[in-house]
């Protein structure tokens, strides 16, 4: 959610809300499992996107997870989903200086998006909340108000900051650049946009930057899980309440589905997308964190090359008002098959697009 007119974009008439689309998987090294769920909620259109991706880089398994909440249309969020992580993992300093690589990838992706939008005389934008798992490091970056929260030692800890125009440092930056912040239902940049950092937003780019804030956490046996979600969840959940709910459900896909379903029940008026990553430092690779719908277990596999499996390379479903699910043929049958010898056990991967 971002632009002023989006606040009125859903109907007040009773609507049938479909069950969230969901899926998940387990890393081949058994160090983490993940699940996701996504729903248009009460809205007639879907502008949330997400990515769950596991790559083998220099013989090391790397996890990349992201939630992207579009405004002014779905184009920007879809673009960021498709390009951000590809730009990141090809950065020459991705392993050696991950934070610098993330900053460069965010800004490069934004620059390329703006070129695309400008050539078509269009303007759309997107938040991003991303989590990169590299070795024993969790590196979280964000622009906008899609939030990242971890549970460490049983406590909820925000590892991102919502970028809002009324925050003193953000307001000062905007005003120093020649912009202004005014109240229009909530505080907005130029009276229009409710976030102060985002991808895209061509007409406000001088004030609405895509420079990410980055926070790093050590992955150890006190780090239990991570929640990434769009503001459709956080509008009706505190950090503590979300963490408490995930604690009750061992499987990350079921956790994500429960959060999204409960957000709908609580009256969230926005699209809702959630990714849950569980860290399995104390558990073996055969841990039961895989969804109960899958009876397969990860097997030992050959040494890794530069292997990539992402949520948009497996079976995809298009969800939205009036659209039937669309099956997309897997583009990498040799690496993204349903065999237990794959790098990750992917299930029901979803592209949440309208």
From Swiss-Prot:
Record note on cofactor: Binds 2 magnesium or manganese ions per subunit.
Region (Disordered): 289-354
InterPro entries for this protein: PP2C, PP2C_BS, PPM-type-like_dom_sf, PPM-type_phosphatase-like_dom
Enzyme class: hydrolase
Family annotation (Gene3D superfamilies): PPM-type phosphatase domain
Cofactor(s) for this UniProt protein: Mg(2+); Mn(2+)
Entry similarity comment: Belongs to the PP2C family.
Name the record gives this protein: Probable protein phosphatase 2C 69
Native organism taxonomy: Eukaryota, Viridiplantae, Streptophyta, Embryophyta, Tracheophyta
